[in-house]
Amino acid sequence: MVKYYCCAGLLKSTWDQVCVAFWQRYPNPYSNHVLTEDIIFREVTPTNCLISRRLLTKTSRAPRWMERYLPKHMASSAYIIEDSIVDPQKRTMTTLTWNISHARLMSVEERCEYRINPDNGSWTEIKREAWISSNVYGLTRAIQEFGLARFKTSVTKTMKGFEYVLGRMQGETPSRTLAETATERARETALAAKEKAKDLASHAHKKQYV
């Protein structure tokens, strides 16, 4: 059984600005959990759409009751694949993100669509959908509730991070100074581990956007 969640967001910046900020989001004070990001591939289609795939390494501390279901070396980090397509003619950007780590325990798939706000052409609206599933017998509901709560927290941080980067792009004084995204040891560990995950990301099944 899959738990579905949907929400909307609004950024008071143009669609073009948001698209630029999307590729410059990290680091920001609200993304301490993002350790690394790598572009796996990128191409421009005959219709001038930009298609990209990124591999993200994030910290992902599980609650104690979940840790026993995870390998010790994977209990504190996760690999995420992010596919995106930017359509300059339709003025839309669609992203699809899903985890390739811990997927047997819990799978979180997110789809976002960025488009011009119909009421104000200088603003950008975001439709965000998530599908959270787990097949752990007896713990499915608890794991899904945990995943949903963490997802909602992540959305809040994502929006604040966007606003921070957009403000910096537009010359505003940031409300907070840049925090360290991780300790050097965490970064070194993530850099070593991500090499193994790159192969998984490059062979992962391409998701559909419709």
Regions flagged by a language model, labelled:
Residues 55-76, 80-83:
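Eukaryotic helix-linker segments that join adjacent hydrophobic helices
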Residues 35, 48-52, 78-82, 91, ...:
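A generic structural signal for short beta-strands and their flanking turns/coil linkers
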Residues 2-8, 69-76, 85-210:
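Terminal "cap-and-tail" regions of soluble proteins that handle hydrophobic small molecules
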Residues 1-63:
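Hydrophobic ligand-binding cavity/cleft-lining segments
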Residues 19, 30, 34, 83, ...:
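Generic alpha-helical secondary structure signal
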